[in-house]
Amino acid sequence: MQLLTRVLVVSCAVAGVVACLAAKDFVKPVAQPAKTYPAHDDHTDEKVAIAADPYDNPDKAKIFSVDFHEHGFLPIFFVITNDGGQPISIANMQVTLITANRGKFTPIAPEDIFRRLSNPQANTNPGVNPLPIPIPRKKVKGTISKKEMDEIESSQFAARAVEPHTTQSGFLYFDVGDIATPIAGAHVDVTGVNDVKGAELMYFEIELEKSQNPPPKPN
């Protein structure tokens, strides 16, 4: 009887561990229309809106199994809504994070994220000048699992077009490890969004600090 009890206890413990692991599987957030996010730029004439939602605090970042902040990355949930009657092309889209001190950062490719996670000292932003006095980083052990690689791949913003009356979304990752407060005074510039005839829309500029403010309550 005691043996059976011990077996049941162990089985329950194992089941609990499995359940916890399963619960940690990444699920990409369901995107809302871009203009509903605090940090967005809405081109009403062109009927296209783009939003940027930084996952820069522990509560939001807990959807990931990877601690991106610990490795110097800023995940931004990027949302494009096309309310027009024609598709738009984003195959040549360029996204740039511009900080308060005019530092410019472009999204990091998955393979560069893998390299940083495997080797925390790796430089994934060779084109960006470091700060005169780098912010000391916590020593991080380099390792990456297949699950983490799959999570990074599946979370990426990968759309090449946005069909009429639809929204596309996904994460862009920026290497901001040397910046203490990357959101303060920063904005995201977006170019290379084209209409169905190939003409480029006016560039989008999104003030990231607005993401720190809750949306106003309806009257």
Sequence positions of predicted segments:
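Positively charged n-region of N-terminal signal peptides that target proteins for export
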Residues: 1-6
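Bacterial N-terminal signal peptides
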Residues: 8-19
